[in-house]
Amino acid sequence: MLDLIINNRKITVRSSISVLQACESAGYIVPRFCYHEKLSVAGNCRMCLVEIQKSPKPVVSCAMPVAKDMVIFTNTPLVKKAREAILEYLLINHPLDCPICDQGGECDLQDETLNYGSDRGRYYEFKRSVEDKECGPIIKTIMTRCIHCTRCIRFSSEIVGLESLGSFGRGRDTEIGTYIQAFINTELSGNLVDLCPVGALTSKPYAYKTRSWELQKGNTIDFFDGVCSDIIVSTRKSTKNQVKNNKIISVVGDEILRILPNHNDLSKDNWISDRSRYAFDGLKNSRLSADFTAWEDYILELGDRLSMYTYGEVIIDEINGPKISVRTGAMVGSLCDLQGIYFTAQFIKICGGTDLQVGNYRSKINYDILFFYSLNRTIASLNALNTLIILGLNTRYEASLLNTSLRQHQVNRSLTYITIGAYSTLKLKQKHLGNSLRTLISFSENKIKLLNNCYLELNPSIFYSYENTRVKHGGLLQNVIRYLGKKLFTKTLTGERLGIVHSNISSLNFAHLGITAGVRSPLYVDTIKDKQFATLFLVQTEEFKSEKWLSIKDYTHTISLATNEISTLKYDHLVPIQSLYEKNGFLFNIEGKLCKLNKVVSSKSNARSLETFLAALLQFQEDYDFTWEQIWKFEDEINFKSQQDKNIPIFLFNLFNFFEIETSAKVFPFAPTVSNFYLNDIISLNSTTMGECALFFTEDSNFQTDI
């Protein structure tokens, strides 16, 4: 610790920080353009100049380390004049197009010029202009506005690991670009827009739509992957009304215009993936609407609470009254919260059935204890890793922020990452050993010389993908992983060395609720179609393989409960439900933390939540006794369940049990776990922006994933 004097005030700071960080810790604001706390120091904008006693000229505070008994001044006439001169220099070639710039109202250059700049300009020469670059469907460039802060270059090389952006030219001919014409191909490209302090990089889907002061902001949780980052959803009220018989029935709900990252407590990063940021426009395309005339009339006459009862009557009437029975099943897609899964499970249980699962294939995983279906550590604790073994997992596309954190820790500490599985460019320095189970078995038997010392490392860990537990030989893979886990845990009683990564929230919520599909057996894969369902519910399903669910001999009444319509699915009836932006709810993330979803936008259609639909359906079945109070008690039950999970011991030796395998232990290759990052759920499949990203950024693969 060092003692400093800042503006005649004595403070104590750490010896490892810069002058700028010391000033901020003391509460003094220092303007900057190039400096960012998550990036390396560049020091080329010169906006953060401060005066230091006994220094002949102003000092760049972001690049100057603190020293003992240093005396710093941030508001002297010398500092003010220097900042004014720097701003005048930066504005020499900057265009005067603030009225049409999407950055207007949120522009750092506007704010700094107002606070520290001059009220007049003295430049009368020709301004230079720079040709705009084509970076893809996400980023719109107006390069004449660029002030060469190099934030975008440092982000792409340090955070993403993509060495495509750089600066070239000298003096007034300096430009930032991709050297040769190319798109910025990364799943984190939208963060470049947030980093740009001026309007040089703006969001192409958001272009010319609104101004920042017109937006209403709400905080919620991202639900497109298992990390569940904190996000800020910006909406705008619509002035259009729905009119019927010269009466205003309802005001059209809010419209989502933009999603930005909030401060993430998990990884302490302010990044989100492009799918989390831009997939919301899928709710505008092929959105299901509830055109129940009788229901709308009841809303006007009885009010919103009583309309739920009439909702059940109308639903029953609209879908010709399917009778629920023991032969009732449900398949849940990747975007379903705890309430939806909980009430779907209760619904199937009341019907007397057991057939409920996520996707077309059942996972061969043990849901009895948190240790077997959780990451078993926080993302922030990744800095304690020495060696990480990644088994059949594409961290870049299954958990983008997890991959970013792994890269950051590798850059800072020179970590070793070992991958076994389908090769993919994770933007990590990795040793890829092979693509089959043979490699994993050899490693578990200590037959790989390269990894002989892995068991002797202080803290080796294993991450593997939930998706690989759903393939035909998932049970065999679980056996090998459990054998390897038992070997690694021989000398340390900790559960942090073995973790499973879920790519979607539905599988996490299933696991935490302890819901297991069908018979408790790993052999339960293809027998489900012999059930001959009378009624089958598809909940937010992005894919449905009828040959795995339905018997050709028997007709099944199929009902799709979804926010959007997928033309490739086969169903008898479509029932609209609310999206997770339009309701309050709960979900678990990969750390096992219970997160709360907040309603940030109202539904444009008359859709209700999934649990309301199922409750209404049960309400009007003659053979079942169901009360509406069960819905309102859900929050208490979930809180109790989460508290129970915390009390379960995370590690026990006798839980390393092995599955019985009907087939011989033969080698099989790891299939790619993500076929298309941009089109991976029912909302993104309907997103125009995600469709363009998939067209420009994805590569075709002939690898058969259905094995």
Ranges and model annotations:
Residues 39-40:
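AMP-binding (ANL) adenylation modules
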Residues 1-24, 32, 36, 51-55, ...:
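N-terminal export/assembly segments and adjacent metallocofactor-ligating motifs
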Residues 360-646, 706-707:
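Non-catalytic alpha/beta scaffold blocks inside enzyme catalytic domains
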